């Protein structure tokens, strides 16, 4: 793998990965240790942190730009159910999905 093809493969596969192991497998990595090391070198952060950030960006985008039901957003972002989405938002974004969406709507007015 060249560095460029590694990055391309990660960007192509990350939306289907729930964790580091999933992403390594989707990227056809022969070793999880080597995958983590290469990822850290090229992305300048651990895999799990990067995946969490990407998921947070996706959640925010859907909450702020769509009127999709929260269950649909949960499914699109890889959460088992709406409760996991809510927990993720509270932990990583500082508020509930409903409040994040409401605050965005209020800011537009």
Segment roles from a protein language model:
Residues 4-19, 39, 43, 60-69, ...:
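Basic, amphipathic alpha-helical hairpins
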């Amino acid at each position: 793998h060249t560095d460029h093809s590694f990055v391309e493969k990660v960007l192509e596969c990350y939306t289907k990965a729930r964790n580091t192991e999933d992403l390594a497998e989707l990227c056809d990595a022969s070793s999880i240790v080597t995958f983590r090391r290469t990822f850290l070198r090229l992305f300048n952060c651990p895999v799990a942190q990067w995946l969490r950030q990407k998921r947070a960006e996706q959640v925010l985008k859907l909450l702020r730009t769509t009127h999709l039901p929260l269950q649909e957003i949960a499914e699109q972002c890889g959460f088992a159910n709406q409760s996991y989405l809510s927990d993720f938002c509270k932990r990583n974004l500082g508020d509930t999905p409903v409040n994040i969406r409401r605050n965005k709507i209020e800011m537009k007015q």
